[in-house]
């Protein structure tokens, strides 16, 4: 008993004197905002996407906040974040009033990029804010249509030097909802494409169709991926690796 008390006493003295180093909790690299509010078609994959991004961000050392309140888009609130992820934040193209990026919120998003920060758009982030051309330029294009259902298609990595594609296989077959775009900016750095002929169902052979791309825009970095219509997508190693690299890219200076 005396020996145990002596050991505890010596430990307390050592700690108070700073003799023993106690590892501190790792400091966060910064904050990521995941926004998934939608006023158009609501994707059932949104909860899975948010949870996956929380896990991926935390593993990379970031604090991840999630919101569906458009009031988060103020200059004051956005300044605490390094990366903004827009998860299937669709609006109704037939209802301009469904768009929440208006006035000061537009200024806040533009200021966010101007400060050298990063934006990631996922899936229906391209199906949003059709009445704000700057938004479409930021994303790289607008959703136009997709084949019926979630058919299997063949994806090809065309640029493996990007962090988002560095760990992906050269080609893969997977199921998803495959987007085609209008007003696509051909100057995008395209990372992944799909062969429309591989989808079948009479899809026109417009080869190749871009699915994942990035570019420098407005003073910051923007990454977009069309993948992720289904909840199951976000547990696939392919998607986890893609999103891990996308966050690294968006957070880089």
Where are these regions (language model features)?
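Bacterial N-terminal signal peptides that target proteins for export
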Residues: 1-11
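Bacterial N-terminal signal peptides
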Residues: 9-19
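N-terminal signal peptide c-region/cleavage motif recognized by signal peptidases
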Residues: 21-23
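Extracellular ligand-binding/catalytic regions of CAZymes and related secreted enzymes
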Residues: 26-30, 36, 44-47, 51-62, ...
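Short alpha-beta junction capping motif
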Residues: 32-35, 78-129, 219
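Solvent-exposed loop/turn segments at secondary-structure junctions
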Residues: 38-41, 70-73, 89-93, 119, ...
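Alpha-helical scaffolding within the catalytic cores
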Residues: 67-76, 107, 206-212
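Catalytic beta-strand/loop cores that center a nucleophilic Ser/Cys/Thr
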Residues: 141-218
